[in-house]
Design a protein with these regions (language model features):
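Hydrophobic structural segments
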Residues: 1-263
Length: 263
């Protein structure tokens, strides 16, 4: 629960990075690659990873790593590489699956717009390059309020008919708690009815790798030279040149061998 006094951003959480954080008075290191990739039963300082762990503990430094989540995120590592290369019409090479759910709820007609907009603000309704996506059907709901309840409409002990709107929208599963909380706070009913459905749809905005097109086709050698210059690297490792022009490019910020079939 300590306050952050300063943060250092780096690709890896190395000893040199930790030393710089200590000397600059910072207590947080933000890295792309995690320091720990396996479990440890003891920490003795026998290698650089254990030395970094000990140094971080002794100096109250928090190490936060955004690795594959940043690789797969919209606007993350792959998007930035594609942007620097100059790719157009980019899309995810391997979109994530089983990450989306559908929310269905039933709201009195007069309050439907307020609830719907609150759900959009909470993170619902994003499909591709569109937001505020929903499907709405008018219908009639029935209920009988029991003793001890505080009905928004109708009387205790009487069957009530209410004009309602069935609102259907989509959301990423990690937003579920926030969205349901928003629904319960915004919905006028004491006991709002809602359903959640798991979806098998691919989430086109999130996933591994990027594929896109160059504005103009380039020779393989021209493309490789431009990549080398753009990313300021000393050398590039590549396969045998084929003599073809390059127009469509697939990329991955990492090894990416698992994406070769998709590419």
């Amino acid at each position: 629960d300590a306050e952050t006094t300063g943060a250092l951003l780096g690709l890896d959480g190395t000893e040199a990075v930790l030393d710089e954080a200590i000397s600059s008075g910072g207590n947080r290191v933000i890295s792309h690659h995690p320091l720990i990739f396996k479990g440890y039963k003891s920490i003795t300082g026998k290698d650089y990873v254990e030395r970094c762990i000990l140094k971080a503990i002794k100096n109250d430094i928090v190490i936060y790593s955004a690795h594959t989540n940043l690789d797969n995120a919209p606007g993350g590592v792959n998007y930035k590489i594609a942007e620097k290369i100059g790719l157009k019409n980019v899309r995810i090479l391997e979109p994530k699956e089983n990450c989306l759910i559908k929310l269905v709820t039933f709201v009195p007609t007069a309050q439907a717009e307020e609830v719907r907009n609150a759900l959009f603000t909470a993170g619902c309704g994003y499909i591709g390059d569109y937001d505020s996506c929903s499907y709405n059907t008018e219908g009639e709901g029935t209920f009988r309020a029991q003793e001890g309840s505080k009905p928004f409409c109708g009387n205790i002990g009487e069957l009530h008919h209410e004009a309602e709107v069935r609102i259907e929208t989509i959301l990423p599963e990690y937003k579920k708690r926030e969205v349901i909380r928003t629904l319960l706070l915004t919905h006028p009913y004491e006991e709002p009815a809602y359903d959640l459905y798991p979806l098998y749809n691919s989430w086109a905005q999130v996933g591994a790798g990027i594929i896109g097109e160059l504005k103009e086709a380039e020779s393989e050698l021209e493309f490789l030279k431009r990549i080398k210059k753009t990313f300021e690297v000393g050398c590039l490792k590549h396969n045998k040149l084929t003599g073809r022009l390059i127009q469509k490019v697939a990329l991955c910020g990492g090894a990416g061998a698992f994406l070769i079939p998709q590419a």
